[in-house]
Amino acid sequence: MTNVVAIPADGQAGKKKKGLKKSLKKKLKEAKKNPAAHAKAAKSKAQSPIDRYFPSPIFDDFSVNSEGRKTRLDRKLYEKELARLQVELVKMQYWIKHSGYRIILLFEGRDAAGKGGTIKRITEPLNPRGCRVVALGTPSDQQKTQWYFQRYVEHFPSAGEILLFDRSWYNRAGVENVMGFCTPQQVEEFRQSCPEFERMLVRSGITVLKYWFSVSDEEQEARFRSRLEDPARRWKLSPMDLESRDRWVEFSKAKDEMFAHSNIPEAPWFTVEADDKRRARLNCIQHLLSKVPYVDMTPEPIELPPRLGGGDYQRPPLNEQFFVPNCYP
């Protein structure tokens, strides 16, 4: 059943708006005073995802074709829904900033599964001062001597921050395990310690959301070929990607083992069906919004005052400045 949102009459709308504004100011004051308690209370009172966020009705007729199979999401519909969800992401970040909420998002999956594209759509509308993306490379010789989680911990969010890991500590259970970059003993140690590590994060007040982007071998092959044909995207295809392509079954087994040991109630895995990139992005963003108990605290629009005159200021001569050449007159 589709949810219906009642729209008040004009007179009632004015009163409701004033009351809502007063209520939000009170919530903002409470959030700043006690961020942890506010986040906990908001989480317990939050509406269910289906009540707070639901796709537009226009999607109903475009999900399947005449044969009953899912079709690729139409670009115009996708862009319209993405714009709506990105506005909600801005509201979410504003609440996170002022409530002191901390959240870590992990994006895992096979090569070319669409992790980076989804991260890009999440971060596009957000203030970069409160949102960071971490994509760590191969550990240095010094890092190899440290506690395995150490190089990830140093990037963890402070109060009011959103942190997105484009691949994470689960490299040990995946690529390092399959490619032989670590010992079987190190893999087993990771399987045992990772759940406790994540429980510790949750107990400390950090929300941990783990997304696995699932892509079929046929779709991955098509995306690899697309990257080879596009000079601007060819850098995305590395020798390691080609090696993992030949080890599909080994990676599948490693992923199953990883899920078996780390799919804990405090930080479960959420699988994103990613053969359709557009649908995967929308589904992931929708799910993220449903998991953060935010309320709309965004301030009212600001009215710009008249611009002040220049007074006695005189611009310096243009011939004394260096300009970027105008290549597109």
Region roles according to the model:
Residues 105-123:
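Glycine-rich phosphate-binding P-loop
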Residues 104-108, 206-219, 239-243, 264-280:
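Phosphate-binding beta-loop-alpha motif at adenosine-nucleotide cofactor sites
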